Design a protein with these regions (language model features):
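Short acidic-hydrophobic, aromatic-tinged amphipathic segments that line or gate anion-handling sites
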Residues: 3-11, 187-192, 312-317
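Conserved small-residue-rich beta-alpha loop and adjacent elements
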Residues: 113-178
Length: 368
């Protein structure tokens, strides 16, 4: 059965209204979520650990006898690392090394300059003392979230890293714990949701207060970060993730499809768009999507995301493809084209950009 993904032609008379609708990802204000988060934050500030124990039992169905059990001991991280499949462990180690090397280039340096009158001006770069890392643990496990947040913090010189991760039913990914061990996280707590954000922002008898909270999460986590901002630093209010793949006739349609899937499986609200140079390319990508979807473990989530926010857009030239991509301003942009280098400088609005036929995120990922 064909996936009901939108198909647009950038030269069709009805393209503009359809494209505008595709880009309208405004999330309506949910008063019930806002109030629920306020209540959770207030409870954690008022009660501390008892609130965390109660909320963990309520939302993660995990009953603990005491607050000390909220912390996952380092021995558990080490054993998780040792129990990993050899291939996965090597992949995490490789990713860690590359992430660390990349972010070394981003380190800021302090500087001073002396004016003609002897006055000295300068900038003193100082790392934060303690940072809280939120790692999603609901619909999927993301060891990459640990590495991509913890390692840059270490490179920057952050003294202490506190990680929180929800553990529904008491279950937690060994890959996530192994990544915490690999990235030299200091402490890990099995807490999730708005209550975890509140604990990091204000501290409890067991969870230390941090200077800044980073990492992605669901609507409750995002709302909590928004509400505690000002009392603690945050990275951003992250929305649903997105990818745009620009592909020409030489792109492997199955690789394009898998990269669309890799983004769509994050969340039903994730957006995956392929911009195809020509009707033939678009048809081949569409056929690959229909053919491969049945074998995907997270098929239901992928299908909902593609049907709701996904699209295949036909263009007649690379100039038009880049123009459309710049209007979307995606978080991730792939140039699956024969000669990406000349077009890279024309990309004005994108987060991470991946160039070439071999650089698909499903096989390579920005984390590696």
């Amino acid at each position: 059965m064909p996936v009901p993904i939108k198909r647009l032609n950038a030269n069709a008379p009805d393209f503009e209204p359809a494209f505008t609708s595709l880009l309208d990802r405004t999330q309506p204000f949910d008063a019930s979520v806002d109030q629920a988060v306020r209540d959770i934050i207030a409870a954690v500030r008022r009660e501390g650990d008892p609130a965390l124990l109660r909320l963990t039992a309520q939302f993660d169905q995990m009953s603990l006898d005491c607050a000390e059990e909220l912390e996952i001991p380092p021995e558990r991280w080490r054993s998780a690392s040792e129990s990993l499949d050899c291939g996965l462990r090597e992949a995490l180690e490789c990713a860690s090394e590359r992430i660390r090397a990349f972010h070394e280039y981003q380190r800021e340096a302090s500087w001073q300059v002396e004016q003609a009158d002897g006055l000295r001006l300068g900038q003193q770069v100082t790392a934060l003392e303690r940072v809280g890392l939120y790692v999603p643990g609901g619909k999927a496990a993301y060891p990459s979230s640990v590495l991509m947040n913890a390692i840059p913090a270490r490179v920057a010189g952050v003294e202490e890293l506190i990680m929180v991760v929800p553990t529904p039913g008491g279950q937690i990914s060994d890959a996530v714990l192994a990544s915490a061990h690999l990235a030299s996280v200091d402490r890990v707590f099995c807490i999730g949701g708005a209550q975890a954000v509140a604990a990091l922002a204000y501290g409890t008898q067991t969870v230390p207060r941090v200077d800044k909270i980073v990492g992605p999460g669901n609507i409750y986590v995002a709302t909590a970060k928004q509400q505690v901002f000002g009392d603690v630093g945050i990275d951003m209010i992250a929305g649903p993730s997105e990818v745009v793949v620009i592909c020409d006739t030489g792109a492997n349609p199955e690789w394009v499809a898998m990269d669309l899937f890799a983004q769509a499986e994050h969340d039903e609200q994730a957006q995956s768009i392929a911009i195809c140079t020509g009707a033939g390319t678009l048809e081949r990508v569409g056929e690959a999507i229909d053919r491969l979807l049945a074998g995907m473990e997270r098929r239901s989530i992928i299908e909902k995301a593609l049907a709701g926010q996904g699209a295949l857009i036909e263009v007649t030239s690379m100039d038009q493809a880049i123009e459309v991509a710049n209007r979307i301003a995606p978080e991730h942009l792939e140039l699956m084209i024969a000669e990406p280098a000349p077009w890279l400088e024309k990309v004005r609005h994108a987060g991470a950009v991946f160039c070439g036929y071999q650089i698909g995120r499903a096989s390579c990922r920005e984390r590696v």
